[in-house]
Amino acid sequence: MDMIFKDTECLLFDMDGVILDNTYDNNFWQNQIPSVLAKKRQISFEDAKRLAIQIFNYKKNSKDWYDLDYWSNMLDIDIEKQKKAKESYEKIRLYEGSISCLEKLKGKMKMILITNAHRKTLNIKLQKYDLSPYFDEMVCAHELHYVKEDVQLWYMLRSRYRIDFEKTVLIDDTIKNIYMGLSAGISKAIYLGNEKYASSNKILSMSSINDVPSAFN
């Protein structure tokens, strides 16, 4: 482990599924929006959910998938307002140990949050848990015109923020994002996802964010 992360100068942190759990987002798109859509179109919740899934899947892994303004226009629903609603907002939750992890790593190297979340979504989450003191930059992939599943995003990130990828570690819960980052030149990665994935010479698989600081001791 010490060999893998020797000379790390920059950490790229994902947010959802790494620092925050996915309850908020999953419930919002799978339950709250179909419920609003059902009332708006006077159809059953089940029909609204099927319709929503069909519409959402059409844009999966694209820039529009994460764009609140796009979905507000597409569904004729104020998505930002719905995301701020109490029944949704209260579901924003930190993973246990995430703040402790950030506190242990802050100051040891440059820390950058890189998320697919729209800036409006990020701001809502930061209102509940202000993560900004732990990061040198908080970057929304949307504003670089790509998503993390696209290798071009990583090239844009490297250029915009002058990151030395040879001394950078990416922490993410989506293996495709990790592969794209590595293919763009990122040296190493920590995978915190649910899929079973064996560690390699470039990717260290961990079960919890609590374990991350030990990789940099």
Describe each model-derived feature in a short phrase.
Residues 4-100:
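N-terminal helical cap/lid subdomain that shapes the substrate entry/recognition surface
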Residues 1-11, 103, 118-119, 123-217:
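Asp-based, Mg2+/Mn2+-dependent phosphohydrolase catalytic module
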Residues 11, 79-93, 98-129, 139-141:
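Substrate-recognition element of Asp-dependent hydrolases with the DxDx(T/V) motif
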Residues 21, 113-115, 191:
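Hydrophobic residues in well-ordered beta-strands that form the structural core
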